[in-house]
C-alpha cells in the first residue's frame, strides 16, 4: 500500500481528517463522562445503523433529528478532526462514535461509567464491504482486486488495523456492566429484540409504538433515502463516481464473492486468530 495513509502506534489511518497529534490527544486527554453513550465498531460492521437506532431511541422514535442533522454531527467520530471539534460544543448527555482499537481509546473511559455499545460483524462480510468502500473512497490506496484486499485485511494492513485484534481486545470488556456487545447478524435477524436490549442497557423506557417508529426510521429503506444518513452529503473530493455508502445491508454477501480457495484461506487464519472464544459469541459461526 502507498503512503497516502498515516501510521500511529502500529495502526493505519487515513491522511484526510486525522493526525498523530489528535490521536495522541484523544487517547491521553479526551475526558469521557459518566453520562456518555459511545457506539464503537470496527469499520463496516453496522456503525451507522447502530447510530441511527441509538438516536431514534433517544428521540423516542421521532425522526426530526435524524432527518435534519447529518449522522456524523449527531454522533461525532472523536478521533477525526471534524468530530473532535464538534465534541467541544456537545451538550450532556453526549453520544459519540469511534472505530478506535482499545489501546488507542481515551484512557479516561476505563475509570468512567460511560456506556459503550460494541457491534461486531462476520469479518468475511466486513472484508467484502470494506473492499467496495475502499474502492470508492479517496482515503486509502484502492485495491486492484478482492484478493489483494483480502491479503491486506488478513495482515491487518487496512484502515484501523486488524479486525482480529480489534475484536479480541474490545471483547475483553464484555463482562463489564457498562459494556454491551451486539452483532450485526442479530440486528438483522431480530431487530426489535435488539432495539429493546439497547433500550434496557441505556435505561430508556419506550412504548411499543415508539419502538415501532425506531424500527421504521432506522430501516435500510429509510436510511438509504435519508440524505442525513446515507452519506450523499460527503464532499466530492472524498468519493469517486458511483459511491454508495449503504450498499446492501445483508448477511452472508461474502459467499457471492469468495472463491473456495479464498474461503479456506480465510477460515484457516480465522480459526488461528479466534481460538479459545466460545462460538456463541459469534452468531455467524452458527450459520
Swiss-Prot record:
One of its GO terms (cellular component) is cytoplasm. The keyword NAD does not apply. It is found in: Cytoplasm. It catalyses: an alcohol + 3'-phosphoadenylyl sulfate = an alkyl sulfate + adenosine 3',5'-bisphosphate + H(+). Substrate binds at residues 72, 77. The active site is at residue 99. Its main location: cytoplasm. Liver, intestine and kidney. GO terms for molecular function: alcohol sulfotransferase activity. Keywords: Cytoplasm, Lipid metabolism, Steroid metabolism, Transferase. 3'-phosphoadenylyl sulfate binds at residues 44-49, 121, 129, 184, 218-223, 247-249. Gene3D superfamilies: P-loop containing nucleotide triphosphate hydrolases. It comes from the Eukaryota. Homodimer. Sulfotransferase that utilizes 3'-phospho-5'-adenylyl sulfate (PAPS) as sulfonate donor to catalyze the sulfonation of 3-beta-hydroxyl groups of neutral steroids. High preference for C21 steroid (pregnenolone). PANTHER family: SULFOTRANSFERASE SULT. Belongs to the sulfotransferase 1 family. This is 3-beta-hydroxysteroid sulfotransferase. It comes from Cavia porcellus (Guinea pig). The gene is STD2.
